Amino acid sequence: MLKIKTNEISFNIKDYVHLIMGSKKIGKSTLFSEIGRAECGLDKTLCISMGDEDGHQVLKGLPYVNPKNWDEFHEFVHDMVTHPENYPFELVSIDTIDVMVDMAIDKILKEHLIKYKEPCKSINDAFGGYGRGKEAVCRLISNEIELIKQSKYGLFLIGHNKVRPQEDKDGIKFLQLTSNLESQYYNAFAYKAAIICNIDVEQNIGDAILDSSGKQRKAGKLQNSERYMYFRSDGYIDAGSRFRNIPNRVPFTDDPKIAAQNYINAVKEGIKDADEFSGSDEEFNKLAKKDNDIKEEKASKAAIANIKADEDEKRVELFDKFKELLKSAGTKQKNEAVNLVKEWEYTTKDLETKASLEELQQLITILEKDNFVS
């Protein structure tokens, strides 16, 4: 029977998933690194720099890994979660989610090719079409985020923003500064995030010069610009938070250390309001430390349990596929597979319960060879 629990507000900002959007080269990766420096130290801050992203290159001392495809990313995340003793990090970023989506799409297209023996024209056509390909991409993304979310690591998602035309339920069209991603992919991240921060540059333009007919003859001159981190949507800027009274916006200053502190203070203000906390900063930090210790102790166990459940489900799927292929495979392929099973000293039942996922996949690869010999 389900146990009823009473929710407690965590004072640890690492307990919340953060999504930060901004234009290219505005300083998103730098902001994350400085938040990490302030909260846990740079040596405990990890950037997962996806594919060709290189925001980490100018950040001296920032630990990073650079997975080039989905399998590398997936394997690293699973190892990081199942063996936390090997990874001394407290904060992790995925930089960027735009490239993460590209990797996930490539992965699903490859899975479609393996299953159907022919490529599909686009992700829309994968697995029979009707949106199944995109749904599979979103599931991949959601599963990885959930693993990290339930582990000891605090997660920051870094992405690009873009002005997009939108339309409300009444058909009214408007422009919005939102994610660069398609809405379905963006929502896979946004629904997991407790804080969505959107960085915007506000430019102050001097008066334009008009001719006698009122038409602009000379463009206005840029007087200055100011950058802000938005935590609340204003209709044009897409942002949001589960904290009711987090500030609408705070300055994104040229000094990255100050900008990071502005971000941290804004989140802490939201936490304090949600908990109706009125104590000192010292008391807040003690509670945050306590919540962080609880997260480290409990979270990895939950993530490991999830991974085991995923592996059990995958094992059933691979074993069923192995049995189907065995029925139609040629003699040469069957013999090669059987000899390998004997070499491993497995019985058929062992294959279903003890064989690793890699071993089952190896057998499937043998049986899928095209050069059948009857």
Regions picked out by a protein language model, each given a short descriptive name:
Residues 51-55, 97-99, 161-165, 202-205, ...:
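Conserved nucleotide-binding/hydrolysis micro-motifs of P-loop NTPases
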Residues 48-50, 158, 199:
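Generic beta-sheet signal
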Residues 98-184:
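P-loop NTPase motor core
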Residues 45, 155, 196-198:
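Short, well-ordered beta-strand core segments
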Residues 2, 6-22, 26-27, 46, ...:
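Interfaces that engage single-stranded nucleic acids at replication/repair/recombination sites
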Residues 2-3, 7-94, 98-103:
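Conserved P-loop
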Residues 167-303:
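Conserved GTP-binding G-domain of TRAFAC-class P-loop NTPases and closely related GTPase folds
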Residues 87, 151, 191:
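Structured loop/turn residues at beta-strand edges in well-structured enzyme cores
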